[in-house]
Regions:
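Short, Lys/Arg-rich, polar N-terminal cytosolic tail immediately upstream
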Residues: 1-19
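A structural signal for multi-pass alpha-helical bundles of membrane permease subunits
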Residues: 19-313
Length: 313
């Protein structure tokens, strides 16, 4: 029995080595990405330990004294804990509610378009905003929504109304962030769903046409089931980053007037770590944030695996 086991193990190891040898060019192409990923993603994880230490640059990571859960308790007992958690969850769930279904809907609509020229124009025009940098996008929002010189303010003024200071409104901030995010990325995110629909067997549509199905029936009974596995995987991945709202755009659009709704975990970590030099506190907050994301990812993945055959793991 042991001889057979060792023989099988030897064969599997030989098979792995042989597979690597045959695919050597592919592994060499992967090597730079693996090295970069290891250096900038896995190696910095060593610094997580400062969340449990009274870290100072002078003492270094190893020389700093242990603090236990001191900085976690400091964050949990602070006023900013409830505020940052609430704002992060509101903006994140609002973003998912808008930007997750819209690419699916756009993919379904594009798949139904028959005029090829209009279809290409529509796709290109919706993809282009994705290539606008976050800094430029934030600048555009500030310029457009300026109550004195903004384009929207002037258009509203022609109708006899006055545009309020939306960038200074805590209530308006989540809407500005989410809908600018949708305008910028929905078209690009729909590419995955359009590609999925392009792989659907054309004979299914032909059979449905022969059975008297219209476009709506084809969409519901052919297109939507074809998209469900892809959409499920994307939803699981989105739920795994619920607590990680994009820092750049929020920080660029943030000001003292809207900070009660724009102060999220990532901006607070930046202010504590790089502005106030409270490295241990910022590391503790970041670690807490990542643990919550991991728990959500595993929970949603578990539910998905029980309810369907689709899961990440």
């Amino acid at each position: 029995m042991s001889a057979n086991h060792s023989k099988t193990k030897k064969k599997s190891s030989i098979g792995f080595v042989e597979g690597v040898r045959r695919s050597r060019p592919l592994y060499l192409l992967m090597l730079p990405s693996i090295i970069i990923f290891a250096l900038f993603t896995y190696y910095p994880m060593y610094g997580i330990v400062i969340a449990f230490k009274n870290f100072t640059p002078a003492d270094g990571i190893m020389g700093s004294s242990w603090a236990g859960l001191k900085y976690f308790k400091q964050y949990f007992n602070s006023y900013q804990f409830g505020l940052t958690i609430k704002n992060t969850i509101i903006i994140s769930l609002y973003t998912i509610a808008v930007t997750f279904p819209l690419p699916v809907i756009m993919g379904l609509l594009v798949n139904q378009m028959k005029a090829q020229k209009f279809k290409k124009f529509f796709q290109v025009s919706t993809y282009l905003p994705h290539f606008i940098s976050t800094v430029v996008m934030a600048g555009m929002m500030i310029l457009f929504l300026s109550p004195s010189t903004g384009i929207i303010a002037k258009l509203v003024g022609l109708l006899g109304f006055k545009l309020p200071n939306l960038m200074g409104s805590a209530k308006a901030f989540p809407h500005i962030y989410v809908w600018s995010e949708a305008w910028q990325h929905v078209g690009w995110d729909s590419i995955l769903y359009i590609a999925t629909l392009s792989s659907v067997d054309p004979t299914l549509y032909e059979a449905a046409t022969m059975d008297g199905a219209n476009k709506w029936h084809k969409m519901i009974h052919i297109d939507v089931p074809a998209l469900l596995p892809t959409a499920t995987i994307m939803f699981i991945m989105r739920m795994g980053s619920v607590m990680s709202v994009g820092f750049e755009k929020v920080y660029l659009l943030q000001n003292t007037l809207n900070s009660t709704s724009s102060e999220i975990i990532s901006t607070y970590v930046y202010k504590m770590g790089l502005v106030s030099s409270q490295y241990s506190l910022s590391a503790a907050i970041g670690l807490f944030n990542n643990i919550i994301n991991l728990i959500l990812l595993l929970a949603v993945n578990f539910i998905s695996s029980k309810m369907s055959d689709t899961s990440l793991i």
